[in-house]
Regions:
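Flexible "cap/lid" loop of the alpha/beta hydrolase fold
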Residues: 101, 107-138
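Short beta-strand/loop motif that positions the catalytic acidic residue
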Residues: 195-196, 202-204
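Conserved alpha/beta-hydrolase catalytic His-Asp/Glu region
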Residues: 122-123, 140-194
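Gly/Ala-rich beta-loop-alpha elbow adjacent to hydrolase catalytic centers
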Residues: 87-96
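Active-site loop/oxyanion-hole signature of alpha/beta-hydrolase fold enzymes
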Residues: 46-85
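Conserved HGGG/HGGXW glycine-rich cap/lid loop of the alpha/beta-hydrolase fold
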Residues: 7-57
Length: 255
């Protein structure tokens, strides 16, 4: 994990601190383009590159718990224990969930986009097996035909995000891909108090594969949390295709 710190010129103790954790195949740079540039220059942003992504693309992704522990250590080394907003998209949401297990950190708001509620078991294991086969096949095709990979990414996430996402996918090792899929199929959900649950917003595109599972599990584990559905969108699609409005929405949570 490599943390990128973006601070306003006039940064004070009262400046809201925002943690933005990217999804699989994105990066800190992707979060800057999609979110930071649309949230204003008067906030303090902490934007990590997870292992196997961005400037850390040469490193093997091992686990969400390892990434969260590294983020936690980075925060404590700089005496940052209270954040205005914690944001995690897809894989980033799994890492954010792991981060919530550290009781020495607190957040005013927690925002999860397209995060997994698959927590192991027979169905999750079957899904993990299939997804590993599918993603490894797609990985081989992307390496063989990078241009086609960019085109497919563009169809899902728009022109701006397509090329870097394709490049990250091609650079990623098979083992990192398998480890990420394992984590997203076996999420260890943290125990949250009623107050912590009320700080949580879980959002999904209406076409998101993970939505059905979230609708089933969320009311049982986090009954006080908010579920929002983006009509007409797929997995993590709104944050890239409607980034100006999305960034403004996140900003309004903290200012």
């Amino acid at each position: 994990m490599k943390m990128h710190l973006i601070e306003p010129d006039a940064c004070a103790e009262t400046t809201p601190t925002v943690l933005l954790i990217h999804p699989m195949l994105s990066s800190a740079e992707g979060m800057k383009t999609v979110l930071v540039n649309n949230m204003g220059d008067d906030l303090r942003y902490l934007v990590p590159d997870l292992a196997a992504h961005g400037e850390e693309d040469a490193k093997e992704y091992v686990s969400a718990s390892q990434e969260a522990a590294q983020i936690h250590d980075w925060l404590l080394e700089r005496n940052i224990t209270h954040l205005s907003l914690g944001f995690g998209a897809s894989l980033g949401g799994v890492v954010l969930s792991e981060l919530l297990k550290f009781n020495d950190l607190s957040f005013d708001h927690l925002f999860f986009e397209g995060t997994s509620f698959w927590t192991g078991g027979f169905l999750a294991s079957a899904m993990e097996f299939v997804l590993k086969k599918v993603f490894l096949a797609k990985h081989r095709k992307a390496i063989a035909d990078p241009e086609l990979s960019v085109q497919k990414m563009e169809q899902l996430y728009g022109k701006v995000a397509a090329k870097p996402m394709s490049e990250h996918f091609i650079a990623m090792s098979d083992q990192s891909i398998q480890n990420i899929i394992h984590d997203c199929s076996n999420v260890d959900l943290p125990t949250l108090s009623s107050d912590e649950q009320r700080r949580c917003i879980f959002t999904y595109g209406e076409k998101d594969f993970d939505l059905k599972r979230a609708r089933k599990v969320l009311p049982k584990v986090y009954p006080e949390a908010t579920l929002t559905i983006w009509q007409g969108y797929d997995h993590c699609e709104r944050m890239t295709s409607d980034s100006a409005a999305y960034g403004q929405m996140l900003r309004e949570l903290v200012v």
